[in-house]
């Protein structure tokens, strides 16, 4: 058997031992203290062949990587394992250190040590959580449910000797098992400081106990006639039927037009024969809005009666209609006179009279100032003769002036309407007087 492997192992162990001694002397942390990762590890000089680096009196083969980073001098004396629990002292110390660290952090943050005794149980009696909270008063504890989660919270502040404040606070969360109702959760606090949170178990669901809802559906027999009726389109509603019936009735029996009060028109017109037309009564037919020509003609007929009832500036009789209507009717009358004579849809005038009298539509209105009556008398006394063209031209000029005046009246306000009306009547009287003078001169010739 060769001694070479044994000699190599011994040399390696001696090298490790010498290095460990140097670390023990030069370590500033002191002997017996175990700082974790306090000093940088020297590079591994061993050739390793699968064995760990043991800095101990007795080398331990197969040591874990976590223990290789710690320097523990007690392993030189105590050995690798203990006889009682078959664990190395390093592992035991590590476990104790973890417990001490957790305990220190718990005391620092104010976590009560007794709260670690809380436990939860799920059995046939339901879900139950118990915890020792004797360091908390009842008003310092809060139990609430968020969806299917139970949250237990405690907050305690205590002042000691006026120098410091001890604060304890904890939060515990528990998930309810599936099927438990959060609304059924209730909690109790005993006199010895045990808080119990309970939730009753859900009702057992037995598959056989489920009641089935059964209903027998009747089979109705449908005849062929009902089938044909169902195939027909739906009938209109009663409202539509009534509307159709009323429309049919109105079509068969058209309603007569409502008679309007007749307007007595006194037209003192002198035709070519010098005869005076008598009064005639006719119903005032309102022209359709869409037909502009008929509307203009109807307004031309209604204008004399309206102007006849209009009060002049001489007698001061109250006006029956609005001033705006007067202006509109006067404008329509003058426009109809300027344009070519249009047939009146209400009054049927013979074409022969139109041919004889070129100024048939120029109807002087018998106003209340008395001038119209004199003109009518003079027309009766005159012999049969045609009117000269001079009067026609003068009348056209007067009509153009009247149209201009009416347009100006529309632009003016309502305060000047009475004065403008008087001016229009005066212009009409002057036109009548001019026509009479022209006739007199013709007769004198």
UniProtKB/Swiss-Prot annotation:
Q: Where is this region: Disordered?
A: 222-284, 296-408
Q: Which GO terms describe its cellular component?
A: cytoplasm; nucleus
Q: What's an example Gene Ontology biological process for this entry?
A: chaperone-mediated protein folding
A GO molecular function held by the record: unfolded protein binding
InterPro entries linked: A-crystallin/Hsp20_dom, Alpha-crystallin/sHSP_animal, HSP20-like_chaperone
**Ranges annotated as biased composition (Basic and acidic residues):** 384-408
User: What does the UniProt keyword field contain?
Assistant: Stress response
Give all residue intervals belonging to the sHSP domain. Answer: 109-220
> Its domain of life?
Eukaryota
Q: Where are stretches of biased composition, namely Low complexity?
A: 243-268, 365-377
Q: Where is the composition biased (Polar residues)?
A: 306-315
> Into which family does the record put it?
Belongs to the small heat shock protein (HSP20) family.
Protein name as catalogued: Heat shock protein 67B1
Q: What is the taxonomic lineage of the source species?
A: Eukaryota, Metazoa, Ecdysozoa, Arthropoda, Hexapoda
């Amino acid at each position: 058997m060769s001694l070479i492997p044994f000699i190599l192992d011994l040399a390696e162990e001696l090298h490790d031992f010498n290095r460990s001694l140097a670390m023990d002397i030069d370590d500033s942390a002191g002997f017996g203290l175990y700082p974790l990762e306090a000093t940088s590890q020297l590079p591994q000089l061993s050739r390793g062949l699968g064995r760990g680096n043991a800095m101990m009196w007795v080398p331990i083969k197969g040591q874990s990587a976590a223990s290789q980073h710690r320097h523990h001098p007690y392993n030189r004396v105590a050995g690798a394992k203990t006889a009682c629990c078959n664990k190395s002292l390093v592992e035991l110390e590590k476990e104790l250190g973890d417990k001490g660290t957790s305990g220190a952090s718990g005391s620092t943050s104010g976590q009560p040590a007794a709260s670690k005794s809380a436990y939860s149980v799920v059995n046939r009696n339901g879900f139950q959580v118990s915890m020792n909270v004797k360091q908390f008063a009842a008003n310092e504890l809060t139990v609430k449910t968020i969806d299917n989660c139970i949250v237990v919270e405690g907050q305690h502040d205590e002042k000691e000797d006026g120098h410091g404040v001890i604060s304890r606070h904890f939060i515990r969360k528990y998930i309810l098992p599936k099927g438990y109702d959060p609304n059924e959760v209730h909690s109790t606090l005993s006199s010895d400081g045990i808080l119990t949170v309970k939730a009753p178990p859900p009702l057992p669901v037995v598959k056989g106990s489920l009641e089935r809802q059964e209903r027998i559906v009747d089979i109705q027999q449908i005849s062929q006639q009902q089938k044909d009726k169902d195939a027909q389109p739906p009938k209109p509603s009663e409202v539509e039927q009534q509307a159709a019936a009323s429309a049919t009735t109105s079509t068969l029996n058209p309603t007569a037009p409502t008679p309007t009060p007749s307007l007595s028109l006194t037209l003192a017109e002198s035709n070519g024969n010098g005869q005076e037309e008598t009064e005639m009564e006719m119903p005032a037919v309102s022209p359709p809005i869409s037909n502009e020509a008929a509307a203009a003609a109807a307004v031309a007929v209604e204008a004399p009666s309206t102007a006849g009832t209009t009060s002049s500036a001489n007698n001061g009789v109250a006006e029956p209609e609005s001033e705006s209507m007067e202006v509109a009717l006067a404008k329509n009358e003058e426009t109809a006179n300027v344009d070519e004579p249009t047939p009146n849809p209400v009054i049927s005038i013979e074409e022969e009279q139109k041919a004889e009298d070129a100024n048939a539509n120029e109807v002087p209105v018998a106003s209340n100032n008395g001038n119209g009556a004199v003109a009518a008398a003079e027309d009766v006394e005159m012999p049969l003769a045609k009117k000269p063209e001079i009067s026609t031209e003068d009348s056209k000029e007067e009509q153009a002036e009247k149209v201009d005046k009416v347009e100006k009246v529309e632009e003016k306000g309502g305060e000047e309407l009475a004065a403008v009306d008087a001016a229009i009547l005066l212009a009409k009287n002057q036109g009548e007087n001019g026509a009479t003078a022209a006739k007199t001169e013709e007769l004198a010739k």
